[in-house]
Amino acid sequence: MKPVIALVGRPNVGKSTIFNRLTKTRDAIVADFAGLTRDRHYGNGKLGSHEYIVIDTGGFEPDAASGIYKEMAKQTRQAVAEADVVIFVVDARAGISAQDHDIANFLRKLGKPTVLTANKAEGMTEGVQFSEFFELGLGEVLPVSASHGQGMRSLVDLALAPLHLADPDEEAEPQDPSVIRLAVAGRPNVGKSTLINTWLGEERLVSFDLPGTTRDAISVPFERAGQKFELIDTAGLRRKGKVFEAIEKFSVVKTLQAIEGANVVLLLLDATQGVTDQDAHIAGYILESGRAVVLAINKWDAVDAYQRETLERSIETRLAFLKFASIHKISAIKRQGLAPVWKSIVQAHASANRKMSTPVLTRLLLEAVQFQQPQRSGMFRPKMRYAHQGGMNPPIIIIHGNSLEHVTEAYKRYLEGRFRKEFDLVGTPMRIQMKSSHNPFTDKDSA
């Protein structure tokens, strides 16, 4: 599982700038789970072979008693609880403050691995200028400048060092390709637990309620109609009764990690609430992760015809990037519409792992070009020669030719539609990559 790093510090020390630096390798795909005045932001990052999740928080005042600062303090405590390691950010130019001491006291009591870093340190020399930060009792301080990109690699190295991470290639155990790893994702109270209770039965659900840390992968194997599945915990799977905040607060990270570990994600929406920002963020994360996806609208029986029509239009606009996914209207509590969902899950998994031969891909490509040529860009018109498969789950198609950097996104979508139709690809994203051949004449002219 990906390690989780929380950025903590008082307001305006540059946490968000550090967050953007640490997540830039994955285009800073941010899951901004709305609902509070200042909530936690989640993003993906990568350093060498190691990937991680970063949580950005609001300014932290541990003893805040009311208003926005109380909410921000609550969010920061939850971020720290979710994290494997904390990066405590202070301001190198402003120096140490009473708030810094309060935060340090809070972190020391937790005993969680913590890296102390002084941001805005550009142009400052190490030594006496940073000695005051030793008062915080958190060891050495690492000077960085997020705005200039200085010290970021050292910062992540220090953060990940206490976790003793194995090489991802060595850590990964071979998975049985016949088993579908399924994650049920969705915001709180959309009916995840009700749906899974219906699938597995109450006795099986108990096995999810195990003690463990954020990085524990909890899953339950089961079989349906001869197909083996492994259901990955997304932190909505708990016994009936009171759901304590200490449990609920892990839901976001576990959802992101479950999506990463799944073959297929069932994204559950609430018909009575419509498509929320949080739904759209989770859907975007699924797409960015390249996972096959099935949409299910729960509580369909609880809305009238007008609400249904409004919801369908909302899905068409707000989740347009998932138009390749099957959509099902269900009622988990009444067990209505569930059987077709299984068929779509199996179909999405098969589509994500479909093998496509080079001769067929090339034929489809040339037929598509003959029917509609790519748009000319100045003196250049892209020339496409052949295509082959570059990967599965999700399917990747690599197209070779000349001047392919001028191919528009609209034309790529046109090609994607042709490939999808031929290979019956439903429920999986597709990646199309363009590779232009070496042109010695162009190189010669530019020399």
From Swiss-Prot:
GTP 2 binds at residues 186-193, 233-237, 298-301. GO terms for molecular function: GTP binding; ribosome binding. Keywords: GTP-binding, Nucleotide-binding, Repeat, Ribosome biogenesis. GTP 1 binds at residues 9-16, 56-60, 119-122. Residues 354-438 form the KH-like domain. It comes from the Bacteria. InterPro entries: G_ENGA (IPR031166), GTP-bd (IPR006073), GTPase_Der (IPR016484), KH_dom-like (IPR032859), KH_dom-like_a/b (IPR015946), P-loop_NTPase (IPR027417), Small_GTP-bd (IPR005225). Residues 3-167, 180-353 form the EngA-type G domain. GTPase that plays an essential role in the late steps of ribosome biogenesis. Associates with the 50S ribosomal subunit. This is GTPase Der. It comes from Polaromonas sp. (strain JS666 / ATCC BAA-500). The lineage of its organism: Bacteria, Pseudomonadati, Pseudomonadota, Betaproteobacteria, Burkholderiales.
